[in-house]
Structures are given as C-alpha cells and as structure tokens.
Amino acid sequence: MLIWALLSSVIFVGSNIFIRFYLGSVHWLALIWSRALGAALILGFLVYFNDPKELFLSYFTEISNRPLLWLLTVSTGFLGIWGFIKSIKLLPLYIVIPFTTLNLVTVLVSHFRLNFLIENVTLIGIFLGLIGLFFLLKSHYSSKNKNGWFWMILCVISWGLAYPLSQSLIQSTSPIFFATAMEASVVLGASLLLVSLNKSKRRQVLSTLPSPVFYSWMVTLLVLGVICDGIARESVSPISMLAFAGFSEIGVLVLGHFFYQERMKSIQWLGAFLTLLAMFLVLA
C-alpha cells in the first residue's frame, strides 16, 4: 500500500502548487471553494457506491456525538487557511512557506500519542478562536503591512491545533469520511461570508475566480489525492505518511522556486533538508 501513499504525494504536489500560490493570490474564497468542490465530488462517489440514507445518517450521528469537537476542528482549520492566505499577501513566500510547514511537527506529536495535548486542546481551541476573531476585527482598523506576521503565526498555531483535533475524530471514522465532512463545513463558512458582502463586492469577488476548465482540472487532482491518501492511511503507519507528506511539501517548495525564482532563492536548501528527513523516516 505504500504505492498509494506515494501516488497521493505526487498528486498533491501538483494541486498544492496551484492551490497555495495561484488560487491564494487570486482570492481566499477561490482557495476554499476549490477544496470544497473536491470534497463534494468525493461525497458524490461515496453516495454512488453506498446507501445514501445510511451514509448521511452516519454523518449526522458522528457530528451529533461530538459537536464541540467538530466545531473546534473546523474553526481552527478555517482560521489556518485564512491566516495562510492573508500571510501570502503580506509577506514574501520564502518566509511564509518554511513557517507553515511546521504543521508537519504536529504529525510527529500525534504519532507519539501525547495525550495531554489532546486532553487540553478543547480549552486551547476556544481561547485560540477568541484570539482569531480579535485579529480578524483588528485587521480592518490597522495597516496591512503590520499584520503579516500575525496571520502567519495564527496560521501555524491553528493548523497545529487542528491536526490533533482531527486525529481524535479520524480514530472513529475513515479518513475520506472526515476529509469530506470537514471541507464541506468550511465551504459553508465561506458561503456565509460571501452572502454577507454587498452586491458590488460580491460581483467583484466572483469575477476574480478562475475559469470552470481550470477548476475541473484542479478538483480532479484533489479528488485523486484525497482518495489515494485515504486508501494509504488504512494500512500505512502515521510515520510513513509523515515522510510522504514531507516529499509533497518538498515538491511544492522546489517547483515554487522555479515559478518564483526572484522570491525563493534560498528555498532549495530547505527542500534538501526535508528530503533527507523524509528518507530517514521512511527507512526508520
């Protein structure tokens, strides 16, 4: 089953390049919708191959059993995505990308089952949510240039919290189930934000989104990546998945170096380090 993990990483390299750099530079809504459309397509496959009534009943049961945990997981993941996009607009990519790859550390933390982190993560998540809301409001009344580091740190912390939260959910459900539910929840938040905009602003946002042909290609990549990742996680250890996630990040960094030559001159050294780290983890 290692072939599925490898295939997942190769596919994610291509999709991450465009999602993180192209869609992120177009508009944050474009990035979120691209992931949500992929989740919707995966849900379509699940409905096609399973009993729809039983499938949606299992969704409802899972969410109703632990609603607070689901809410915190989705909100921290959403804050992480938002913080990443805001930091891309305010800081050079050679600063943003290395810091946001710190979320790989949380995979290691979860692998060694540091339960004290998961036990206290609910209170931390609530506290982080309040801080995140404060920064969102504050950004409307202060200079954009001063907030770049704020958003990047918020992104790293949010993703760091979202991962152990999501791991505790994945323990009782399949990875594909979880990925679909979480992405669908995120697009609901994006839709509510879009509805809250006035008519002219909404038209301006929608006019910046990529073409349907581009979306079709991007969503196909995401679906293939998530399906391969879900199959791989059923039989591959978390430490091996960390290694392949490292390879995926390396691809994003190296290809990003060629697309943004003038802005990422030193990134290949980080890529080389991550390559060695990933190889060590695979062999270990």
Where are these regions (language model features)?
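Juxtamembrane helix-start motifs in multi-pass secondary transporters
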Residues: 31-32, 96, 178-179, 241
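Alpha-helical transmembrane segments of compact multi-pass small-molecule transporters, enriched
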Residues: 38-42, 99-114, 185-189, 225-226, ...
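Hydrophobic alpha-helical transmembrane segments in multi-pass integral membrane proteins
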Residues: 43-54, 107-121, 158-176, 221-235, ...
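Interfacial helix-capping/hinge residues at the ends of transmembrane alpha-helices
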Residues: 15-20, 81-85, 96, 104-107, ...
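Hydrophobic transmembrane alpha-helices of multi-pass small-molecule transport proteins
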Residues: 43, 102, 119-138, 267-284
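C-terminal transmembrane-helix exit sites in multi-pass transporters
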Residues: 84, 103-124, 134, 193, ...
